[in-house]
Amino acid sequence: MSKPKILFICVHNSARSQMAEAFLNDICGAELEAQSAGLEPGTLNPLVVEVMREVGLDLSQNKTQAVFDVFKSGQLFTYVITVCSEAEAGGCPIFPGPTQRLHWPFPDPSKVEGTREEKLEKIRQIREAILARVEQFCAETCIRLS
């Protein structure tokens, strides 16, 4: 039996969805498989790459991908989780199909302001919030699968 697939979606697939994908695959990749995509794929946020490297996860070689391309591939997902902020919720893409949809609002790292160090600190806070939510999801989901 194949592992249940999880798709994390945000606007650009440059930060939040990438972090969530990396954490899920790291924490419970033996039971679940995560991917991520965005409405308008961009380039990875270098500050996100930096803060993820701090916790031992290297995103530097990751590519961004479009939700539409994932949809066209015909893959089926058990869960589709949007990670856009509440302010962006209207522009956060939806993924059709027989999936369970969840919304985990997180602030957009590309919109944080301040000095480089202040931005890094704010992105670390977002990273930790995403990590906590993924850990909770993995614990709940893996219990249901066993």
Model-predicted segments: where are they?
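Redox-cofactor binding/interface segments in oxidoreductases and associated redox assembly factors
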Residues: 82-83, 103
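Conserved active-site segments centered on acidic
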Residues: 1-71
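Short glycine-rich anion-binding loops that position phosphate/pyrophosphate groups of nucleotides
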Residues: 14, 85-88
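Phosphate-binding/catalytic loops
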Residues: 88-146
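Residue-level signal for alpha-helical context at structural boundaries
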Residues: 38, 42, 70, 85, ...
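Conserved acidic residues
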Residues: 78
